[in-house]
Amino acid sequence: MRTRIAIAGGGLGGLTLARILHRHGIDTVVYDREASRSARPQGGALDLHPESGQLALAEAGLAGRFRSEARPDGEEHRILDPTGRVLVHHEPQPGSFSGRPEIDRSALRDLLLDSLPGDTVAWRHRLVAATPRPDGGWELTFHDGRRTSCDVLIGADGARSVVRSLLTDVELSYVATLVELNVEDVDQRHPDLAELVGPGNLWCVGVNQILAAQRLGDGSLRVGISLRAEDRPLDSYRSKRALLDLFAGWNPRLTALIEAAEGAPTPRLIEAMPIGTRWTSRPGVTLIGDAAHLMPPVGEGANQAMLDGAELAGHLAANPGDPNSAIRTYEEAMFSRIHPIAEMSARVQAMMLSPTAAEDIVRFFTRPAEPARAD
């Protein structure tokens, strides 16, 4: 009998999982809370790592399409101090795909969505509860009262995962505050900012705070302000005036990134799960991505979510008659893989928002490569 697989969450990890299972002839349903693929902005760009995100896309048969959408020049990054002095300027080799080329999250999500049958994603389905059925499997309840059932439930439902509670009662920790803004049509309307940021990423590093900007493929800039965790209401970050006050004394060329932004700033808490989080495997359910291992956003989250999806899909496809065994194998490997990555992410997050962040980040980006070991 066919195993009915439900994926809660249509982010990059859930869609990667669905795509690879589809390639193996295994159908799934992805339940997503959004009204459509274009219901809300998908955030900025990300760099896909060869050993994780790019590997997952290769397993999905989408490496060629990724190359057509990615921007190798988006790897360029500049690190400045509050005076505007350049501390680090990295320029990738022109046209090279040997590193970690950038791609807009929206473009990557569309690439995955376009690779799936049209009825794979059930939009407007926000999961609110999953209860075990007497004969095995799960009954799923959605926000509007609709219900359905499945044999295997995979939680790809992000930081505030509903599925996570079926496996662990772990609590999230508040580690930082992020405020996001957007600057539209930067080349035409703000050429000085276009030159400042370049084709990739800019980080302006101060004491316990960072002002960053990222070029997107649509000609806009995504501006992000990272601050240490504080006992301060999010509403206090919703005006540009309040944000400019945080950067008093900085070079006006840098704070122009805030002044040029359209619309109100969007603040949010950055949270993380405890490093080393594990759970006892439970039949018919598991987690991938942020639902499984929420980490500070330092470049690993989406990559590891996609690799989770690829590895879980591979185990399910290799053992279709025993999904519980496939889940156990996936989980043990995932726990071991994620632990050092979560430790690294926490260290980098702390380094970036420290009193000595500028010196530490320069040292991090300019450290010599480790010599190859001789066998």
Where are these regions (language model features)?
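FAD/FMN-dependent oxidoreductases across multiple families
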Residues: 195, 199, 206-209, 215-221, ...
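Short amphipathic alpha-helical segments
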Residues: 19, 42, 165-168, 299-300, ...
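Short, surface-exposed charged micro-motifs
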Residues: 129, 212-213
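Conserved mid-domain beta->alpha element of the FAD-binding
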Residues: 6-35, 154-155, 159, 245, ...
